[in-house]
Amino acid sequence: MNTFSAKPAEVVHEWFVIDATDKVLGRVASEVALRLRGKHKAIYTPHVDTGDFIVVVNAEKLRVTGTKSIDKKYYRHSGYPGGIFETNFRDMQAKHPGRALQKAVKGMLPKGPLGYAMIKKLKVYAGDTHPHAAQQPKTLDI
């Protein structure tokens, strides 16, 4: 008996929608990362993109526990000397809702071409509407 290896042509990518209202950032991110990789499927193969498309709505209503809304820092750099910028979770959610979730999920995915392809299947929206109704996404409860 040979080891099963999924072929890219035989993988079916489904669409799911997650409502992030009053959900904890890390718990949503870990479930999203698992489904983007395809590890919930029996045909999971590490070198093939077997994951599904995930649409997250109400990302502006995500929360973190404890004092992380002030203590959790996000860093970025302009590329110039002294060009480091720091922001906390509360300010990032106010200015760019959903970016914290995007960064959390990206950190949980593999680095390299396959991981970059996986993160493109994540669609995050601040409000409760999304333009992916034509794909008929299934509701996913976390």
Curated annotation (Swiss-Prot):
| Record-linked SUPFAM superfamilies | Ribosomal protein L13 (SSF52161)
User: Which Gene Ontology MF annotations are present?
Assistant: mRNA binding; structural constituent of ribosome
| Residues spanning the membrane | none
Record keywords: Ribosomal protein included? yes
Output the GO biological process annotations, alphabetical, semicolon-separated. Answer: negative regulation of translation; translation
As given in the record, the signal peptide range reads none
Keywords assigned by UniProt, alphabetized: Ribonucleoprotein, Ribosomal protein
Which family does the record claim for this protein?
Belongs to the universal ribosomal protein uL13 family.
Q: What is this protein called?
A: Large ribosomal subunit protein uL13
Lineage of this protein's species? Bacteria, Pseudomonadati, Pseudomonadota, Betaproteobacteria, Burkholderiales
